[in-house]
Amino acid sequence: HSVGEAAMGIQWHVLAMFGPSFFTGRLMDRFGKRRITALGLILIAASGALALMGLALTHFWGALVLLGLGWNFGFIGATALLTEAYRPSERAKVQALNDFLVFGTVAVASFGSGQLLHSVGWDGINLGMLPLVVVVLALLAWQGLRQRQQMTARG
């Protein structure tokens, strides 16, 4: 594929990452933070599945767009859930620490991404993220069930 085609895919990916931010908060208010976070994780899994289906430009672009949308819903939803777990006076510091850890990890990981691709391959990367998505979805479901049980116990 050409550099222009790759650049177009990255442009749509970045748009998918940040464009939905204008309405993600309203979606969380309407459907719940946990559901939107779960939707983000499902979209990330779908991006991996699409990437595994082939190496055509449409697979690449589609996977990047799904990954961007998944990141938006997953990251914003999870950040909202995280800050909800703390007192109002602590929330800004917790969010700042979370952002530092997340983006610091991304920066460090970007240095090893080429080596990871070389050692496990395209399919390995896309298959490797699926168990992580399943674990986080299971934790979200467990947290939601626990919260419902606590609310039921309170009456």
Where are these regions (language model features)?
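Loop-to-transmembrane helix entry
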Residues: 1-16
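Structural signature of the two symmetry-related core transmembrane helices
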Residues: 35-50, 130
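Helix-to-loop junctions at the C-terminal end of transmembrane segments
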Residues: 19-33, 117
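Paired small-residue
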Residues: 58-66
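Intracellular juxtamembrane helix-capping segments at the cytosolic ends
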Residues: 73-87
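A membrane-interface helix-boundary motif in multi-pass transporters
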Residues: 115-133
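Multi-pass alpha-helical transporter architecture, strongest
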Residues: 130-155
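A late C-terminal transmembrane helix in Major Facilitator Superfamily
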Residues: 90-119
